[in-house]
Every structure is written in C-alpha cells, then in structure tokens.
Amino acid sequence: MRRNGSYGQQILRNLVDENVNVGFVHEDLDHATGTAYVTAAHGKNAIVVVPSANYCLEPKHLENAERFFSTADLVLTQLEIPMNVVEKTYEFSKKYNKKLGIYASPAARISEEILEYASFIVAKSNELSIIFGEESREKILRKYPNKLFVRDDANSTIYHNGSEMKYHRNDPEDMPNKMGMGDAFTSGFSIALCHGNEVDDCVKFGNDVSLKVAQKRGSQTGLPRLSDFAL
C-alpha cells in the first residue's frame, strides 16, 4: 500500500485506529493515493480506478517485509498493484507454504501458475473473460472447484464444489451502498477460512459481512466487527 496527501493520511489513521500494523506502508512523495470514482445509473455501478501511488509499488518493497510472510496465516492480495508485485507475493507465499487469497479486482489476466497455487480467488461475474479468457462461466468454475468464487452486485456468490454448482445470495430490499461489497466478502471469507471452517460456511460468512457493508455508507467505516455477528 502506498500513500501521500490527505486521502492517504486518512486511510493510514483508520488502519492505526483498527490496530493494523502499518510498519511497512511505503509512502510515495511524488504520487497521490490511488482513488476510485463511482458512477451510478439505474441501479448499476461503474468504477473508474486511478491507481496513482499503488502502481509505484515494486517487488523490492515486499522484500523488505519478507520476514512477515513466514508468520502469516494467509496472504491476501488484490490487483490494484503491478502484476510483478502480485507475482512476488505469490513467490513468497509459496516459499513459506502460506495460503494465498486473490481478490481479482480490477480484473487482469493472472498466470496459470498463480491460479493453481492460490487457495481461493474471488472475481466479479462480468470480468471473468478478462481473467480466464472466453470460456463459459460454468466451465471456468468447474476447472477451479472450491477455489473460484464469482460475485455480482446482488450479493450472490457462485462456485463449484467438485460435484455441483453452489449458489448463495443475501439480497435485501435496502442496499444503499454496493461499494466495497467484494472487499468485505473477501475479508469475511478469509477470516472464516483461517478459523478452519468448511468452504460453504466461509462463503456464507463472506456474504454476511458483505451484506453489513451494503447496508451502511462508507466502504471502510461500514465494515463490521466480529462482535456484530451471532457466532
């Protein structure tokens, strides 16, 4: 993660307030913090991403934090950074035999080597062709059983469990904020997986976390706490 300017300071303060270790946040003095601009029409969202400082991240910055890979329960990455940094993340995860989760957003082509190693991949339904090519959704899901989880704006998640297609949906009438739902699902899924839950339960919990975010304003401030759930 890279930061500079008021947005970056705000993000950093929020992480510190939530007791997140920011010791390896690298500040770029020449670029602003990455932003995303959202347009909404007829219930559909379109996102314009401006990576800015995120795309200044380099593999050497991960090398400075390599020792923390060995103590991680799971390594989670998105595609808001250069692909060579994603590849370095994979290399360290494999080196230390760590679970690797990928939220494939913004969508980009990912090497087969990384896809095969990943513990799970979360992708948007309308971006599968960018990541996997022009095969049908069903064929792609069957190729990655219990690994690929496909999401849409209705807070539904589809995956193949090796025997059949599975479908989970939490879609109330009131979802004022659809921004951050994918991040929330991925976070909830990751937490459940690290606690040893079965895949189906990980999906259900990810959906529940995503729903909490959708019912509030603010992709970060809307994120729930574990105490918000009856476990």
Question: What are the functions of these language-model segments?
Answer:
Residues 1-73, 229-231:
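Conserved N-terminal subdomain of the carbohydrate kinase-like
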Residues 109, 137-231:
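Conserved phosphate-binding/catalytic region of the ribokinase-like
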Residues 74-139, 155-157:
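Conserved beta-alpha-beta core of the PfkB/ribokinase-like small-molecule kinase fold
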Residues 16, 94, 142:
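Anion (oxyanion) recognition and catalysis
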Residues 8, 34, 86, 186-187:
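A general structural signal for well-ordered alpha-helical segments in protein cores
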Residues 48, 131, 213:
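Residues that scaffold the ATP/ADP-binding catalytic core of kinase and kinase-like folds
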